[in-house]
């Protein structure tokens, strides 16, 4: 993650801890969590919260750049609305996987529009891969 501010890299990586804990717990491998369903609920709840949070980051990029049109703001609310819509669906983890792939596409779109820091994709790509691995591990528990 060269060029990424150390604080963003470290805190971003720390944000993967609940995903990893949920994935391990879903397989009964997390000390102190005896019910694998708890791991799935951790992944669902935390995954939805982070997906919505990341949409808020995109909103912030548009606002910081002084954008006033609909395009950037409308696109930035999509991850949060998706997270809300799928949180309690029967296949929430698959839906969150789709949501995080879509979010990465939005990250790339915003960079193409010149929004967000130049290092954003270098941060987001490895974190998204980590999230997708953890959600997939939980999905196939």
Model-based region annotation:
Residues 17-20, 74-84, 123-140:
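Small-residue-rich segments of transmembrane alpha-helices in multi-pass membrane proteins
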Residues 58-85:
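Helix-adjacent hinge/juxtasegments
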Residues 86-102:
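Transmembrane helix-loop-helix
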